[in-house]
Amino acid sequence: PPDDATLDKFCRLYVKTAQSAELLALWNVGAEREVIRGCDATRFTELRALEPYYHTRPWSAALAGKRVLVVHPFRRTILAQYEKRTQLFPGKDVLPELACLTVIQAVQGLGGQDTGYADWFDALTEMERRMDAADYDVAIVGAGAYSLPLAAHARDTGHAAIQMSGATQLLFGIKGKRWDDHPVISKLYNPAWVRPDETEGISNKEKVEGGSYW
C-alpha cells in the first residue's frame, strides 16, 4: 500500500478475513498470539498440515473428481505440469485426476513490479471478478498478499478454499530456490519437476526473498 489510508484499509480487510477463517495454519512465532486472541471462532493447525506431500494420507486426494480453480502467478507452468501429474509424486495420491483445472494468473506486484492497476484493491477486485466467472468447486490460492482475501472471497461465494500460498507451486511439481536444499522437499524433486516458465518471472525477482520461487 502506497499511503496510510490504503494501508489502514488493507489492515482492516486482513483482520476481517482472518477472523472469518474456519481454519488457520500457524508459523509458531510470537506475534501469532494476537491472531489466536483475535480469532475466537477459528480453529488452528500447524503450517505443514496445509502441505499434502508431507502426509501419508494427503488431504489433496479429496480433490479427485472436483473442479479446481488455482490462483497463482505461474499459470502456464501449472497447466503444463498438471498434464504430467502421474509423474510428479509417484506412488502417492498427492495430485489426483481432477474434473477440470482452471488457473487464473495472479497479479504480481512483488519487488516493485508494475501491476498495471491503479492500486492494490483494483487488482484484488479484478482477480475476484475472474474467479466469479470460473466454474469450480475448490479454490487453491497462492497469490502473495492477495491470497487470504481471495480465499475468503471464494468461501463467501459458496466454494471451498485453501490458501497454500508459496507452497502451491510444489503441488504441481514446480521447483523453487527456497526448497532446493530443503531436507524433505528437495527429495521430492524428480525429472518431471521443472522451474517456472521463463515468461513467468519478474524483473526484480532477486528482491523477493532472494528469488525463492524461481
Predicted regions and their residues:
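Glycine-rich phosphate-binding "P-loop"
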Residues: R37-F44, T102-E126
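Electropositive, gly/pro-rich neighborhoods at or near active sites that engage anionic ligands
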Residues: P1-E97
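Gly/Ser/Thr-rich loops at beta-strand to alpha-helix junctions
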Residues: V29-E32, P73-T77, I140-P149, S165-Q169
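A short, acidic, amphipathic alpha-helical segment used as a generic capping/interface helix at domain edges
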Residues: K9, D122-D135, Y146-L148
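Mobile, glycine- and charge-enriched loop segments
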Residues: S60, R67-G116, Y189-P191, E200-W214
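Alpha-helix C-cap/termination motif
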Residues: T17, A133-A134, T157
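Short coil/turn segments at beta-strand junctions that form active-site/ligand-binding loops
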Residues: K66, D135-D137, H159
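C-terminal functional extensions of proteins
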Residues: P149-W214
